[in-house]
Every structure is written in structure tokens, then in C-alpha cells.
Regions:
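Active-site beta-alpha connecting loops in nucleotide-dependent enzymes
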Residues: 45-48, 339-342, 364-435, 445, ...
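Short glycine-rich anion-binding loops that position phosphate/pyrophosphate groups of nucleotides
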Residues: 45-47, 189-190, 212-213, 251-252, ...
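Glycine/aspartate-rich loop-and-adjacent alpha/beta segment that forms the canonical ThDP
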Residues: 461-494
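N-terminal leader/targeting and accessory segments in enzymes
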Residues: 1-99, 103, 276, 301, ...
Length: 496
């Protein structure tokens, strides 16, 4: 086992104080899973002083402690254990954690090729498509993000789109152990701001777009954009890999990032970019896209519907090309990609009613989603949507405006209310609803979906937005089983 002192030196972690030394075999910040020989990290918490957990961690065999306060450090020293101090007020604690986590766990991201995808919309679909295409082309690949972790060895859900540093490094080890050679992962703005992904050595970073979201966390669009830029401007400094920035040049922020990146850049778009796309045909559950890159030409027949998925396919193709895969092969792999669960997912039926379940939960995502549906020329669009509780309140009326602008009828309901009053959330939404918008309030989501489908006639499309693949609803702090797709099927059964 390596010595703690050696791990500190190799990691480049800057610490305020160090006392003692010991062999280290792992790292953990959870007393439920800490093991013999681990470095136990006392992560700052609003709910308790995590230094109080040191005795429990030591009782389970922890060999050393990383503290974030002088008192915590001194307490660890007094218990006779090697300890380190990185005061959280210096702003270096998060840096020390990701550096030590990556080093102690053997820098797993160096052993695979990693594609990181960031942007307001399209992260999940783009990352999913990259993984699906790689698998189709014979490359064992993994996915990590909103849909959980999927490796050649299996899959499961995750609590965060991009987990915290220690958990993330352990997941990377899991990816390596599964036999995967590639990983496509979503990189959220929260994770970039909180330095969660700094210990990941990316080969490729894909930028999809930037529109309003998460302003409750970031405070402003400038701060939000700055967080996204870290994937392209700061994280490449932490790796010896040849990093390629893949940027949507049709998006103003993508063009701005291009002007700042020092390394290799590959741009894509429909109007601008090295890789160009053109939508030839878009249907409810399939699309045709023409692609060109230099002298190369290819046509993609994808098993996805909706105009916005044309952009996602283009993003994924660009990411694959950045990995060194030629355009024709990338297209062949993408043609075999399975549809993404809960992303423009059609609920098929014999009633002649189109039903789409989608995760769209921002004004821009809803605009693109409903624009895609409108492009299919339905008789009417009936939209069911709500807004998540304990999240950005400023976007609620904007989401209403986006929905009303492109829907013939609207059913406003609950999403994941969490600890907020569902009626108060809907009241915020209704501030964006003009008198001309044909909208009704049905707070219970089950009843709302049933109401929307009962209103539908042959040739109409019912769009159920906001939760997508989720098979639960969060009420308070409890996850209650609920699946929009199943609710839609049950509502269809009740039609005459």
C-alpha cells in the first residue's frame, strides 16, 4: 500500500497542516462504507460537524483523516491517527479532495477514453448516443449521468448527474473493472462549479448549448456560463491527454468558448462548424440526417424522433469524430443506437393519438420539444407540465410562456414538488399564462395525464413533459412510485 505522504506529493494537493504518516489503501467520506486502511474525508456539511464521525470511521479501520477545520484536525491528532488539514475557508479543500481521491484510487480515468458532455439541454441524449454508437462499433463503453451508470457489467441509478469526487472516482474504477475502454458522461454545471469532475481526465469535451436554467444555484447567466466553460478552459490543465473541445458553433456561447480555448477544437452546427448537418426527414420516432466533414459525406437514419434530436445526433457524431472515428463509422454506430428512455419517447397505441413523454424542464427545452412536435403537423398539441420544487423559481412563468406559445391546450400540474407546496408552485407557473392560453390546473399528476389524454382525439399529440424516464415523484423528501409512460398507457385503456 502506498504511504499517505507519497499520495499527497503525487497528487499535488496543497494542505495547511500534516501530522503523521500511514499506508493508505482507499478513500471514503461515508462511515457506512469506510474500510480498513482508508483515508477518511470529513466533508463540510450544513447539517452537522462531520468531524464528529471520526471515532466511528477509526473504529471501522480508517487509517488517516482529512479535516476541514483546525478543531477537527486537532481532534484527529489527539486520537493518535495521521491527519491532514485543508481549511474550507481557504477554498482549497475541494481541490485537495479530488486530487487525493484520483491519486489514491489509481487515476482510473487515465485507463479509459472519456467523453464529457455539458450544456443546458441535450447532455443525456448526446452522452447516451455516444455510448450506444461505441458499443455498436465494438468498443466496450459505459455511460454515466442522469440515467445512472451503465457499463458492460450492468446498470443502476445514481443520486446525482455527476457524483461528488470520491464517489465519482470509485465509479470510474467500476467502469475500468467492467472492461469498458470508453466512457461517455454528463458533466453538470453544479459539478463543474463544485469541482466534482476536476479529477477526471477527459479526452473530449462536448458543449451542446446554453440557455436559462439553474439560476437559483449560479445566480446569473454569466456565472452559469463560467461554470460550463471550466470543462474546456480549466479541466484540460489537469491531464496529460490530448484534449479536444467539441463546440456547437451555432450557439453563441459555443462560439465564445472557441475563442478562449488554447488547445484543439472541433466545431459543429447546421449553419456554422467543421461538421455540418442537415435534417432531411423528422418523424415521431425516426429521423434522417445528412452529415458532412471536409470531403466526407454520410447519411444517418436514426431511431429517434423530434427535430431537437437532429441536433443531439449531430453533437454525438462530432464527439465520436473527436475520438478519432471516421464520419461514416460514426454514422453507422449511431444508426444502431437505441432511443433514450424518457427523451421524446413515444407511447404507441391504436387510438391514433400521438403521446410523447419527455424530460424537458427548462423554457428552451420545452420550446424545442414543442417545436419538434409542431413540425410533425398534428391536429392539436395538448401539453401536460409542471415545475420542480426547491429549484429555480424564476423559470416557472417562462416555462408557462414556452408551453402556451406552442400548445392548443395545456394542463398545468405537479412535477416533483419536493418540500414546496404544489399549489404555490403552480401559482408561480400561472403568472406566465396569458388569458388567451387554454390552460387548466390539475394538481395531481395522475389525474392531469388522464385529463389530457381524455381530451385528445385522433390526430392530436399529447406531450407529457418534465419527468421523462423517472419512475417516481418526489413529494417532501420521499420518492413515490410514478411513471408517466405507465400512466399514459392506463389512461389510454380507459378511452372508449
Amino acid at each position: 500500500m502506498p504511504l499517505l505522504s507519497d499520495a499527497i506529493e503525487r497528487s499535488g494537493a496543497v494542505l495547511d497542516r500534516i501530522s503523521g504518516d500511514a499506508p493508505i489503501s482507499g478513500i471514503d467520506d461515508d462511515t457506512r462504507t469506510v474500510s480498513e486502511g482508508d483515508l477518511f474525508v470529513c466533508m463540510p456539511s450544513d447539517s452537522r460537524d462531520t468531524h464528529e464521525l471520526i471515532p466511528e470511521a477509526l473504529g471501522k479501520g480508517a487509517a488517516a483523516v482529512l479535516a476541514h477545520s483546525q478543531e477537527g484536525f486537532q481532534g484527529a491528532v489527539e486520537q493518535g491517527v495521521p491527519a491532514m488539514l485543508s481549511r474550507k475557508e481557504t477554498g482549497r479543500f475541494e481541490d485537495a479532495v479530488w486530487r487525493l481521491a484520483a491519486e489514491v484510487l489509481g487515476r482510473p480515468s487515465r485507463k479509459i477514453r472519456v467523453v464529457g458532455v455539458t450544456g443546458t439541454n441535450g447532455k443525456t441524449t448526446t452522452a447516451w448516443l455516444v455510448r450506444e454508437a461505441l458499443m455498436a462499433l465494438g468498443h466496450p463503453a459505459a455511460y454515466l449521468g442522469t440515467l445512472g451508470i451503465q457499463t458492460p457489467a450492468g446498470s443502476r441509478e445514481l443520486a446525482n448527474t455527476t457524483p461528488f469526487p470520491i464517489a465519482l472516482q470509485k465509479l470510474l474504477c467500476e467502469v475500468v473493472e467492467s472492461g469498458a475502454t470508453h466512457l461517455a458522461m454528463e458533466v453538470s454545471s453544479h459539478a463543474l462549479e463544485q469541482r466534482r469532475a476536476d479529477g477526471v481526465e477527459f479526452d473530449v469535451g462536448v458543449f451542446t448549448n446554453l440557455t436559462q436554467d439553474h439560476l437559483d444555484f449560479h445566480g446569473s447567466m454569466d456565472s452559469y456560463a463560467s461554470a460550463k466553460r471550466r470543462l474546456f478552459l480549466e479541466l484540460p490543465r489537469h491531464t496529460s491527454k490530448r484534449f479536444v473541445a467539441v463546440l456547437n458553433k451555432d450557439d453563441r456561447e459555443g462560439a465564445a468558448i472557441e475563442s478562449l480555448v488554447q488547445g484543439q477544437v472541433l466545431t459543429y452546427g447546421f449553419q456554422h462548424g467543421e461538421i455540418r448537418g442537415r435534417a432531411d426527414r423528422v418523424e415521431l420516432d425516426r429521423l434522417t440526417l445528412s452529415l458532412e466533414h471536409g470531403a466526407d459525406r454520410a447519411t444517418l437514419e436514426a431511431q429517434l424522433g423530434g427535430a431537437f434530436n437532429v441536433t443531439n445526433c449531430l453533437s454525438a457524431a462530432a464527439g465520436l469524430v473527436a475520438l478519432g472515428i471516421d464520419l461514416m463509422s460514426a454514422t453507422r454506430g449511431l444508426a444502431q443506437a437505441r432511443p433514450v428512455p424518457g427523451r421524446f419517447e413515444a407511447v404507441r397505441n391504436e387510438k391514433g393519438i400521438g403521446i410523447i413523454v419527455d424530460y424537458a424542464h427548462t423554457p428552451d427545452a420545452l420550446t424545442k420539444l414543442l417545436g419538434s412536435v409542431r413540425g410533425l403537423k398534428p391536429k392539436r398539441i395538448i401539453t401536460v407540465f409542471g415545475c420542480g420544487g426547491d429549484r429555480d423559481k424564476a423559470k416557472r412563468p417562462l416555462m408557462a410562456q414556452a408551453v402556451c406559445a406552442q400548445s392548443d391546450a395545456v394542463v398545468v400540474t405537479s412535477d416533483n414538488p419536493r418540500t414546496e407546496d404544489p399549489e404555490a408552485i403552480i401559482a408561480d407557473i400561472e403568472r406566465g399564462i396569458e388569458p388567451t392560453c387554454r390552460a387548466v390546473r390539475v394538481t395531481d399528476r395522475r389525474a392531469a395525464i388522464q385529463r389530457a389524454i381524455s381530451m385528445a382525439e385522433r390526430g392530436d399529440v399529447v406531450v407529457i413533459a418534465g419527468k421523462g424516464h423517472e419512475n417516481y415523484q418526489i413529494i417532501g423528501k420521499t420518492k413515490v412510485p410514478m411513471d408517466d409512460r405507465e400512466l399514459a398507457r392506463k389512461a389510454l385503456e380507459g378511452l372508449n
